[in-house]
Regions:
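Extreme N-terminal starter segment of soluble prokaryotic enzymes
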Residues: 1-4
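A generic structural motif
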Residues: 43-47
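Short hydrophobic/aromatic beta-strand micro-patches
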Residues: 8, 48-50
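A short beta-turn/loop motif at secondary-structure boundaries
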Residues: 37-42
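An amphipathic, aromatic/His-enriched active-site/gating alpha helix that lines ligand/cofactor pockets
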Residues: 26-35, 50-84
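Short, low-order "capping/linker" segments at domain edges
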Residues: 86-96
Length: 96
């Protein structure tokens, strides 16, 4: 199971966001196998998370560890309700 979250950091907030996310995950997150943080050329931060199962992913979204709630004050809002675009689904292929 893979989830991807895209946010647009406020000016000079990239390092703060990365540090907050890494600090919140330093002791591990149940079911999170690997995560990557990418700073794109379009002033976006892209988080790619690999989960052991959909259940682990859903549990995380509903927990107090929810990444979006942690960083939303450092992000530009997309609309009234959202600071991110999020996608999730099964991993169909991964090369070695």
């Amino acid at each position: 199971m893979v989830s991807m979250v895209i946010v647009h950091p406020k000016k000079d907030a990239v390092d703060d966001i990365v540090n907050l996310v890494n600090d919140s995950r330093k002791d591990g997150v149940p079911g999170l196998e690997v995560y990557n943080i990418i700073n794109s050329n379009d002033e976006e931060l892209i988080f790619i998370n690999f989960w052991e199962s959909i259940d682990a992913f859903v549990e995380y979204i509903n927990s107090h560890h929810n990444m979006i709630e942690l960083i939303e004050h450092l992000c530009v809002r997309i609309d009234e309700e959202n600071v991110s675009k999020a996608y999730s689904g099964p991993l169909l292929y991964q090369s070695n």
